[in-house]
């Protein structure tokens, strides 16, 4: 391999899953974080891996983790609060970068600000948010070609308790999904002051999603310039989605999360064992008159297991050598068929709607 793979946030829930996935794929990553005892315990469990101290509150410690051609994987969130240290470190070092961010405004920063000055490849939102939506959208567009003018992507969970299924870190980051300033794509990425809501039919049910910003708004039009409109929806909040749509963005976040039950974040931090969540992703392509051209449905298991598997795979591919630079989506970085196979390996694959 050309460079080392470093996991920043290795002792967090997603970080530890990612470390185990990499070891399972034959890689010995460097484990980085601020809790020396937890790092030592995880390193010993995984066969004596190298560890390194780094704390996002002290950016120079994060910068010391990587040099040119290394691969920095960061799972440290909320990313709007803690993510910039790793992102800036990778860009400054010329190291490749993958994150598991789902926070829209942070994803936008990577594409709008950091991507243009990077001499390495930056792969933001490289987890359950937003790799499957990129895959489903690209598969739909590949099927219908230039006839597509609009694409709608929806992310949905099922199969178990949302509280037991989601980690504390996800609940801390959840307000960033419905942030005060959101964006969409209408012949370019533009601000969206209020949430939009739409229903998706899947597996004999109607599921409601509320609009969010994602990497799809940047990546799908880049590879399909005929697109005029890209929408991404999150189906976590059920009936609260329609309440959120009537409120300004900041209040929408509080309403949707509050509606799901008081103390969710506190309960999630006490999360014992694994939940039983399943994943469902849909992409629907439309022509310029609003006619449905095709739908692609993906289905799989636990989103955290998927994130760990796909991040581990992506980090390995990048470490083996990348000539591309700047902020990219997963299809542009690796190719459509390769990405579909990798997602299936990680636990999410194509199904009949």
Q: Where are the language model's segments positioned?
A:
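Conserved Rossmann-fold cofactor-binding substructure of NAD(P)-dependent oxidoreductases
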Residues: 53-69, 74-81
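N-terminal Rossmann NAD(P)H-binding glycine-rich loop of SDR-like oxidoreductase domains
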Residues: 5-25
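C-terminal helical cap and adjacent loop that interface with cofactors, partners, or active-site loops
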Residues: 272-353
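Short, conserved SAM-binding/catalytic segment
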Residues: 41-49, 113-114
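Rossmann-fold NAD(P)-binding glycine/threonine-rich loop
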Residues: 100-120
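Active-site-lining helix/loop region of Rossmann-like oxidoreductase modules
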Residues: 8, 142-287, 291-295, 305
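N-terminal Rossmann-fold cofactor-binding loop
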Residues: 32-36, 55-56
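Rossmann-fold NAD(P) dinucleotide-binding segment
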Residues: 64-68, 80-99
